[in-house]
Swiss-Prot record:
This is Alanine--tRNA ligase. Zn(2+) binds at H574, H578, C676, H680. Its EC number is 6.1.1.7. GO terms for biological process: alanyl-tRNA aminoacylation. It catalyses: tRNA(Ala) + L-alanine + ATP = L-alanyl-tRNA(Ala) + AMP + diphosphate. Binds 1 zinc ion per subunit. Belongs to the class-II aminoacyl-tRNA synthetase family. Disulfide bonds: none annotated.
Amino acid sequence: MAVARSSRTDAARPRTGAEIRDAFLAFFEERGHKRMPSASLVPEDPTVLLTIAGMLPFKPIFLGQQERPAPCATSSQKCIRTNDIENVGRTARHHTFFEMLGNFSFGDYFKQQAIEWAWELSTGVFGLDPKNLVVSVFRDDDEAEQIWREVVGVNPKRIIRMDEEDNFWASGPTGPCGPCSEIYYDFKPELGDDGIDLEDDDRFIEFYNLVFMQSNRDAEGTLTPLANRNIDTGMGLERMAQILQKVPNNYETDLIFPLIQAAAERAGVDYHQLDEKGKTSLKVIGDHSRAVTQLISDGVTASNLGRGYILRRLLRRVVRHGRLLGIDKPFLQAMGEASIALMQSAHPQLSERREVILAELQREEARFLETLERGEKLLADVLAAKPKQISGEQAFELYDTYGFPLELTQEIAEEHGLAVDLAGFETAMEQQRQRAKAAAVSIDLTLQDAIDQVAAGLQDTEFRGYEQLEQSSSIQALVVNGEPAQSAVAGDAVQVVLDVTPFYGEGGGQIGDRGTLVADGQAGDGLIVMVESVSRNRSVFVHSGRVQRGALAVGDVVHGRVDRACRRRAQANHTATHLLQAALKQEVDPGIGQAGSLVSFDRLRFDFHCPRAVTAEELERIESLINGWIADAHALEVQEMAIEKAKAAGAVAMFGEKYADVVRVVDVPGVSMELCGGTHVANTAEIGLFKIVSESGVAAGIRRIEAVAGAAVLPYLNERDAVVKQLGERFKAQPGEIIERVTALQDELKATGKALAAAQAELAVAKSAALATKAVAVGDFQLLVERLDGVDGTGLQGAAQSLADQLGDGAAVVLGGLPDPADQGKVILVAAFGKAVIAQGQQAGKFIGGIAKLCGGGGGGRPNLAQAGGRDGAALASALEAASHQLRESL
């Protein structure tokens, strides 16, 4: 029996990238899946440089190394892949950054249910015609083939068996593995079902991959059934957007094309008028802009190592392709702004990290531009000699002297039909390594590179900060002004590694301690370093600050003193965070889990999984409950125990966090028990007071509460009281009368707004009377396309309808304008069509929606009257010209 399809109408089906993402997650959430947030692009898995697949955050669960958060889950995971970076922009579907939609079963449902849901989602929710779909199965997976054919009802000719290379997944040479089944979209179903070749990328696109983890492979290669079978699936968001938005490639979807338009505007070009080379450059800029923005947001900084090198390479490719398009001024910040604006609704952390992102983009672009021009000139001189290839020595000179990445040299050489002598390059590189090693010189290290270098050869730092706030220690290593060093003097920015420390290193959401390092046994004039932050590199604690007086050197003994006031505030906020999670579980939902946190000296922030907003009444009860626990003066109990014992005792662990076999348990008896390595008060009474500042949503299914505790509460209340007093003075009202005064003012503004809108509508209609004379005859029809600024959407609709009424059944009226001429970021477009125009096959809703895309927007409405909007006022004139041209051609 075939699986039934949904009756959802075309209008109700998702189209935009955001709608597709939400529809996918909602579909599986409705079927019992726990909606999980996207993990960072910087993975917990030390064997992987970046998050490359939607299943990566769940890999420890699939491998039996971590408990499952729920029987099944769904997510939209940020991913980065750079293994085929040379294909980005040249093919329809290759990207560096992309989102992978997925549904996962951890020993819950299996093959048949996964297949049925995949088909229901594809044909029902997304409305794909089964005649346009082809499925692949592993060559030996008779069960999957039978389900597709007999249960789902797929035409047997459209079920293709594939080899192990294409349709079998394994976690490694040994371990969990299983067959795959994929769903492909057929862009040319008219070619028939005979001889289907899924390698034909022009005809087929794979958009949904189902992995059935059903076996364990031993060292002999023998497969045995797994006790708990799992499901791992992945649907490319960009690919589904291409299919549903009916565009020729992923780049022209609403997920990327606004960035291409932003780059084209910077270059002063029209994407659709460019040759393939120009389009490729715009696609590279659009793709890489998303990638670098997300990488920086997740904490990656440009460097010459690891993921930092990937970021640097992507940034430099953007600059390079910008120059190919004629952009000779810095523009990375502008692309960063555009990327944040495009993606922040789905990824709110981008707006929170905006300043960091833009600063890194500006800094790295400036650094590259300083050397790029000289490097390009040298390469041009090399190419002018018309060599048969670029020698390894020449490529290395560009890399070593001018900071020119080898990949960039290869790209430019390829554009001229040349190759680069890679073997010669490696020889020159190795010779340089040997010279550097002999001279003991580290070249072009960023601060993080330098810290990584010095920390790599050191033993773990012994942390004694739970018991004491002062400690004498030996300096193990120094980084001075971004370089490994043996000594430092007054004025130097330093990172100090000690063998023993009382300073807490940032971790578990809690920021690192502040304090001082002084010459051992001295004070006052003996002050050496003001410690501003403490971080961890693996288990090596790095104390960052600036030398105030004197000098220090590797091997010196210093005395560390933690700032007691800062530590007390951090402790109060951290314990308050535990109480907050306990109160949320008690008052809102016992299943609430932590999604992230920040414990600083002056505030706390707690992110948690919750499908709805916490009500004002619930927040009031939570606040009261926490202050009650504080007043009850609970003495905290802290102990170390085996993780199995801790979990059996009910200790709360954070999903995604890695724990050792022995863990530290912080217990507020009868209230809260959590696995935690942070610092805490000895008694809840030390917190003093707790006050919630705000509750908000930060992502789908993720809520955030911000609060203050302890010494930070009184300044917060004083600040609020000052605001109330200022409002009272402004409104000439007592505090208790302010709400009444504001409500009256809102009512007055609302009435004034209505009157203004009515006046604008009347004015627009009056203006339109003069426009009617500008209508031109196109056969039996009257065509009028005009610009009318300073009128809102309601007024523009009224004007268009008035003009259509005047011009009769053959009227085709299109009006566009900027409601506020000073704001180029808001465009209004309206179409009004008479009965004869509609009978000709034109519909105002579809027509104006298409025109609005030229202004970076969209919209629609009824066949006779419709409105759309856009974000690019500079494109309005060309959009109106396009509207006139299209109507002249079709009428």
